[in-house]
Amino acid sequence: MILTLVVMFLAVAVTIGFTGLCSFNPGKPENGPVREVDAAPFVNVEARRVDYPVRLPKVPEGWTSNSTRAGMAAGKQTTIIGYVTASGAFIQVTQTDAEAGQLPSDGKNRLRDGTTDVEGTTWTKYEPAEDNVRRVWVGDLGDSRAIIEGTGNDEEFTQLAAAMQKAEPIDPDATMPDSSQPQQTASETPSAPAK
């Protein structure tokens, strides 16, 4: 019986080996290209959907927005934009009207690690107390709160915090063109055929 299993294993290994459907590549995996997401249309929709001011931060050159989604924090709605930084780290900002004292509210084990001042705004820092938990900064922007979370370094967290503070809230009443459709100008508008 064992001999039969060995023969079957060898037959399968040889068959798969010749087809090239299986490969062995030791070493660290390489990251593929970052999938870029245009955050502007999402933020414009969110500005109409939620009851707090929503901002689109102007991030440093080399950063790529790669995710957008709505969520919940401390029982309140959130607007979330994720970025891959120029160094390849992931960092996201969550905007909400939940109270700063209730954040972060994801139930993950973090320890409060003091505060840092970014251009006059105090951000409370939380460091992970266990593996697979990201660090977090929470800032009160007055009319909303921002939660920065990710694998970025202090400089990248500071850059995103400053960008959030400088960003103006999106006007929910402003009409935004549909970016997926080309816009016609008055000179391009087709006229009715002459009779």
Please name every model-derived segment.
Residues 16, 112-195:
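A short, solvent-exposed beta-edge/loop patch
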Residues 34-128:
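Short, solvent-exposed recognition patches
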Residues 29, 80, 94-98, 105-109, ...:
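Surface-exposed beta-strand edges and their flanking turn/coil or helix-capping segments
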Residues 2-12, 16-18, 54, 59, ...:
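Generic hydrophobic secondary-structure signal
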Residues 2-74, 178-181, 186-194:
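N-terminal "mature-domain start" segment
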